[in-house]
């Protein structure tokens, strides 16, 4: 099945190769497979999926019982069997975020969060703490008019790229998340000190633009490192990790 019938992120899912159609007054269902085409009408990647959907701000394909995340360039990554399950360590804080209405519903919480969805979370928290916040300004990016993105950019929580784009469906890294969380925390009226008297073992891999934010978020307990005293700045940041850290930010400022 297809859940979208228009171009999203420059791509559109279509059905191909049907040999049998079951018609009705409401439409028809074929027995073909599905794939993505670009705006020139060319297939991008394989087109042998049993189902194809736009889920969690990305295309997810299904072959048999296996699910795949499509990168929009022809590549695909098979999702782990537990992709739709919340991690045990995150359950309590995820539930708290839902209770505080600062969460989003993700089908696959273990997948990396996109820039647009991080903005949606950040704005949810901002509007929770600042209920009289002004409306989103006019779109500031050539490729994105999402209201949460526009407001997050106007507040200084996120920035775009030199070419005027925002790249909303690009995933964020851990150090990018730290920088955005730090700016969000400041926007909410607080400022964390960037104590780094105990640097991470991979401190040299931190971007200069992110270093103070990484340690500031550690200092107030919003975002911690990983095993062996490493931060792993270029690793992806999952959707459930994003919700958990936004919940921690809420606890820190409420």
For the regions a language model picked out, list residue spans one by one:
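C-terminal/domain-terminus segments
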Residues: 238-245
């Amino acid at each position: 099945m297809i859940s979208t019938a228009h171009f999203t992120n420059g791509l559109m899912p279509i059905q191909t190769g049907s040999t049998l159609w079951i018609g009705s007054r409401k439409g028809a269902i074929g027995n073909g497979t599905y794939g993505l085409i670009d705006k020139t009408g060319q297939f991008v990647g394989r087109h042998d999926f049993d189902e194809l959907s736009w889920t969690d701000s990305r295309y997810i394909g299904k072959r048999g019982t296996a699910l795949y995340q499509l990168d929009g360039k022809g590549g695909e990554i098979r999702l782990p069997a537990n992709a739709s399950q919340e991690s045990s360590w995150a359950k309590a804080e995820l539930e708290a975020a839902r209770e505080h209405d600062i969460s989003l519903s993700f089908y696959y919480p273990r997948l990396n969060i996109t820039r647009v969805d991080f903005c949606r979370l950040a704005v949810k928290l901002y509007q929770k703490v600042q209920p009289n916040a002004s409306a989103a300004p006019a779109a500031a990016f050539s490729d994105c008019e999402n209201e949460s993105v526009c407001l997050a950019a106007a507040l200084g929580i996120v920035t775009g790229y030199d070419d005027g784009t925002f790249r909303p469906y690009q995933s964020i890294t851990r150090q990018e998340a730290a920088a955005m969380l730090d700016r969000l925390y400041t926007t909410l009226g607080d400022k964390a000190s960037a104590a780094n008297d105990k640097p991470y073992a991979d401190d040299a891999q931190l971007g200069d633009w992110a270093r103070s934010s990484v340690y500031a978020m550690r200092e107030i307990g919003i975002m911690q490192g990983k095993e062996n005293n490493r931060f792993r700045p270029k690793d992806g940041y999952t959707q459930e990790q994003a919700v958990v850290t936004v919940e921690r930010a809420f606890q820190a400022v409420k």
